[in-house]
Amino acid sequence: MLVTPLLLVTLLCALCSAVLYDSSSYVYYYQSAFRPPSGWHLQGGAYAVVNISSEFNNAGSSSGCTVGIIHGGRVVNASSIAMTAPSSGMAWSSSQFCTAHCNFSDTTVFVTHCYKHGGCPLTGMLQQNLIRVSAMKNGQLFYNLTVSVAKYPTFRSFQCVNNLTSVYLNGDLVYTSNETIDVTSAGVYFKAGGPITYKVMREVKALAYFVNGTAQDVILCDGSPRGLLACQYNTGNFSDGFYPFTNSSLVKQKFIVYRENSVNTTCTLHNFIFHNETGANPNPSGVQNIQTYQTKTAQSGYYNFNFSFLSSFVYKESNFMYGSYHPSCKFRLETINNGLWFNSLSVSIAYGPLQGGCKQSVFKGRATCCYAYSYGGPSLCKGVYSGELDHNFECGLLVYVTKSGGSRIQTATEPPVITQNNYNNITLNTCVDYNIYGRTGQGFITNVTDSAVSYNYLADAGLAILDTSGSIDIFVVQGEYGLNYYKVNPCEDVNQQFVVSGGKLVGILTSRNETGSQLLENQFYIKITNGTRRFRRSITENVANCPYVSYGKFCIKPDGSIATIVPKQLEQFVAPLFNVTENVLIPNSFNLTVTDEYIQTRMDKVQINCLQYVCGSSLDCRKLFQQYGPVCDNILSVVNSVGQKEDMELLNFYSSTKPAGFNTPVLSNVSTGEFNISLLLTNPSSRRKRSLIEDLLFTSVESVGLPTNDAYKNCTAGPLGFFKDLACAREYNGLLVLPPIITAEMQALYTSSLVASMAFGGITAAGAIPFATQLQARINHLGITQSLLLKNQEKIAASFNKAIGHMQEGFRSTSLALQQIQDVVSKQSAILTETMASLNKNFGAISSVIQEIYQQFDAIQANAQVDRLITGRLSSLSVLASAKQAEYIRVSQQRELATQKINECVKSQSIRYSFCGNGRHVLTIPQNAPNGIVFIHFSYTPDSFVNVTAIVGFCVKPANASQYAIVPANGRGIFIQVNGSYYITARDMYMPRAITAGDVVTLTSCQANYVSVNKTVITTFVDNDDFDFNDELSKWWNDTKHELPDFDKFNYTVPILDIDSEIDRIQGVIQGLNDSLIDLEKLSILKTYIKWPWYVWLAIAFATIIFILILGWVFFMTGCCGCCCGCFGIMPLMSKCGKKSSYYTTFDNDVVTEQYRPKKSV
């Protein structure tokens, strides 16, 4: 099971209990009398804890709390709250617990106790050992439940739930109604016995596991990995494997990317222009009769009031009742445009008396402020006060201003310019709604500056790169230290899968490289520990097999760790690359040819989220898709099974192709009879002229010499060979040479000759000639030897440099060939990656199309249209599954071929012509390549051909017997005719030889048997007139219109592998290596033996005598000389040796007594 059963907690009955689960992290209430059958069911009634707090005392410093009142409440505004006391509980006493309550808006439910006369305002006095649960609305009690303390000895918990306003006391339901209202406030009033723990909760859906009507386990659908997996598949039991999922509860944020860091906006300035009214009449009596002109009212924005005509008028200050009156306006009309703010503003002009006209207009509410100006007008304006209505006063200009304070309206002299500073706060690594340079959408933003900055993308003031659908793919933002590049990915990865190993949810496989992820094959793995993501750990362990879930060569264990699957037979496998040490002999009529061959042995695995591909994020489509049953599971099972079989076969392939060790045969003590196989075995070392005893008794000295040293050595062989030293001298290129080594005998001989030649002057001077001649010959030998060594060194260096050059060129050509293979495979992978990325983009388009269908049609028509889309997309997924199966079959066949190639071409020498390269196989070197293996075959191909006459066989016709036929035996070759004679030769190499009995097979007849195949036997042969193709096609494809959605158009050029030029270069390198032979000048090694001096031989003689004496003494003292008396002939011991020696005889002063003991049987 994926989840851990909570065996300590069981819900007993409907609407009667509520217990906290999972270390009190959530609570589950099943509120129905109907019990679902056993199994997992998606239910409501689960509440997850979002906040925890504690309180130790809220009764202050008093000796106890006051019973019968509600106190200590706190505002929560939550779906549920649980208030719990310590496990020992709290006593129903004012010294500890008084009241607990919950407020559901206008309804309050509480539990309390009160045993005082007149001191219980809420419940009245209760009898001893009774408690009261009550509910009241707007101060009026409407529910009472009296319970004995025998049922609840102490206060333990008080839980309130919004669903049907349920209240639980000590886990038992004590109040409910038919309303669902959130808890607004709650609290416990107590003095001691705490602390009281408050757990505020929110409502979530839950997947509950029922057994006999009782919930045994609960999984919250809260967006956690465990909740996402269980609630999407409606089960908590999962076997090991991979489970695609869709996270529809993504937290969405929003950000905007601006084109510029700041924007200047010029606002509109509204101009109001006032002028003098030339035809205005004097006002009648009373302020209400003053007529207004040119009323201008500002709405919102910026305004300019133009009073330029006032330049010919004289402003009249306020003087009691005369002139202007504007105490509420701290400005003059000349300064009204100086950036003043108003909520409302209206201006008009009028003509009235300067005496009291402004003041009375403000008092009567005609204006907020009034400004008076004199223009020398007539005194024809009537008064405005009650005693002056019939009096005439000087007429003046009155300007009415009606306003209120605020910020909707601002005055200005010029159009204002507003600068807006833009800050690009980009939210990374989460799903967001974005507005990037005016293009809106939803995506997962990642920073790709490190990988994109070196390519100078968008270097010419570009802002973004769009994909084929017109959406933003990559955009750039100017940062503090240069350009920053960001990539927009789909919010939901269609390849994301949960990994279940050992029955536990251990990780996530995704195609998105997130922080802390770990690359496994072509996916990224994120380990999950305790329901949360964790940073990656390196792979440090190898396992021989994986009993859990595996992905490629990686084994995912139940603790989430990763191990590499390495079968035991592969642990010590090391494949050398170009370490070729074999010697190949090539016939003159053949050329060495190098052929490369690439075989694919593995395939890229693809994971598709079926539900996401079909419906996108449309909830209506997903609801309709439930009618299709497990079709997605069937398609995914096909794709996943292909991946699993691919992994298993790949491991078996590597296991089966491991090179086995070869045991060296031991051929000692093997008799081959009359067959001489000495040429096949190692030649024994030839015996030297000196024996082992000579090598032991003489010191040898080796020296490098000329080829003439061998003749000199043979000439001086013998006991007195040193006398022939000068006579055995040889010539080399016209120079007399002797080996440079002189023994002691030669030195004594030549020294005595030189001394004798100097005894009598010129008479004996000729005796020095041998000494001078041998000295000159030895100097010649040394000079020539040094010259030859120098020449050989130059030849070796030149040839070695040439060989190294050819080897480097060969490795470079091989590297280029492999690089081309890498490029081809990489481009194929890039095409697949681009295809999957485009599918990700298309999923967003799918959601948009479905959403438009539901917006444009009613429910029935929309479901019909979406049903067609679902059918089409399921068909596409079926085609994908079939394609992966076909690809798997093809790759599996390629693996079988690769296995044959390794076994037949690499581990052995193939006898099949052109199976391992072109021509007859010599050697094959394997090399790892992307998704496969490259074989480099060395073979020899014909260079020249001989035109011969071939004969199938011979028909023999004896004189006195029936005729018979002979044909070549299998593998022996073919019969040929050369110059009238018949021979047999191999089919692939011209080697004519006489025909022997072992080369033929005898046939009983010279006739050939023919088998005729009738047309009716093989039914696959079809005449042209058997059926009409057009007629047959019209039956099944008649006026049928098939339209496929126009997704991204792919236009890819598939690369073709061509490395012929590199192979030609390798062949040239081989020819160059063949030419790098070294023809060195021949030298020889001369070994000269030098005898030891006389004192060495004297020491050897003394050591031999002492050894013999010690050996005789040992024989005498141990009485074991009986077998040696005749050999040594020691006469004084004969009498002792004549006696019988026994292990049981004791000697004292030679022979004193002789004791015999019984002999023991052995």
From Swiss-Prot:
Residues 1117-1162 are cytoplasmic. Changing N709D: In strain: Isolate Vero cell-adapted p36 and Isolate Vero cell-adapted p65. Keywords: Cleavage on pair of basic residues, Coiled coil, Fusion of virus membrane with host endosomal membrane, Fusion of virus membrane with host membrane, Glycoprotein, Host membrane, Host-virus interaction, Membrane, Signal, Transmembrane, Transmembrane helix, Viral attachment to host cell, Viral envelope protein, Viral penetration into host cytoplasm, Virion, Virulence, Virus endocytosis by host, Virus entry into host cell. One of its GO terms (biological process) is endocytosis involved in viral entry into host cell. Residues 822-866, 1055-1083 form a coiled coil. InterPro entries: CoV_S1_C, S2_sf_CoV, Spike_S2_CoV, Spike_S2_CoV_C, Spike_S2_CoV_HR1, Spike_S2_CoV_HR2. Glycans are attached at residues 51, 77, 103, 144, 163, 178, 212, 237, 247, 264, 276, 306, 425, 447, 513, 530, 579, 591, 669, 676, 714, 947, 960, 979, 1014, 1038, 1051, 1074. Residues 1024-1105 are annotated as: Heptad repeat 2 (HR2). Changing G405D: In strain: Isolate Vero cell-adapted p36 and Isolate Vero cell-adapted p65. Residues 769-874 are annotated as: Heptad repeat 1 (HR1). Changing K364R: In strain: Isolate Vero cell-adapted p36 and Isolate Vero cell-adapted p65. Residues 19-1095 are extracellular. It comes from the Viruses. One of its GO terms (cellular component) is virion membrane. SUPFAM superfamilies: Coronavirus S2 glycoprotein. It holds the Pfam family CoV_S1_C. The chain crosses the membrane at residues 1096-1116. HAMAP family: GAMMA_CORONA_SPIKE. Homotrimer; each monomer consists of a S1 and a S2 subunit. The resulting peplomers protrude from the virus surface as spikes. Belongs to the gammacoronaviruses spike protein family. The di-lysine motif confers endoplasmic reticulum localization for type I membrane proteins. This is Spike glycoprotein. The gene is S.
